[in-house]
From Swiss-Prot:
<dbReference type="InterPro" id="IPR003398">
    <property type="entry name" value="PSII_PsbN"/>
</dbReference>
<keyword id="KW-1133">Transmembrane helix</keyword>
<dbReference type="GO" id="GO:0031676">
    <property type="term" value="C:plasma membrane-derived thylakoid membrane"/>
</dbReference>
<protein>
    <recommendedName>
        <fullName>Protein PsbN</fullName>
    </recommendedName>
</protein>
<feature type="transmembrane region" description="Helical">
    <location>
        <begin position="4"/>
        <end position="24"/>
    </location>
</feature>
<dbReference type="GO" id="GO:0015979">
    <property type="term" value="P:photosynthesis"/>
</dbReference>
<keyword id="KW-0793">Thylakoid</keyword>
<dbReference type="Pfam" id="PF02468">
    <property type="entry name" value="PsbN"/>
</dbReference>
<comment type="function">
    <text>May play a role in photosystem I and II biogenesis.</text>
</comment>
<keyword id="KW-0472">Membrane</keyword>
<comment type="similarity">
    <text>Belongs to the PsbN family.</text>
</comment>
<keyword id="KW-0812">Transmembrane</keyword>
């Protein structure tokens, strides 16, 4: 395989992995640990 194809596939895999991790963090079990700054602020 040409180096450009390997690099393109590798970069695409990294982008998909980062997207998956961010979705898991936002909506999965770790989202319970996230806090909302608007809820923390009292007027």
């Amino acid at each position: 395989m040409e180096p450009a194809i390997v690099l393109s596939i590798s970069m695409a895999a990294v982008v998909v992995a980062i997207t998956g991790i961010s979705i898991y963090t936002s909506f999965g079990p770790p989202s319970k640990e996230l806090n909302d700054p608007f809820d923390d602020h009292e007027d």
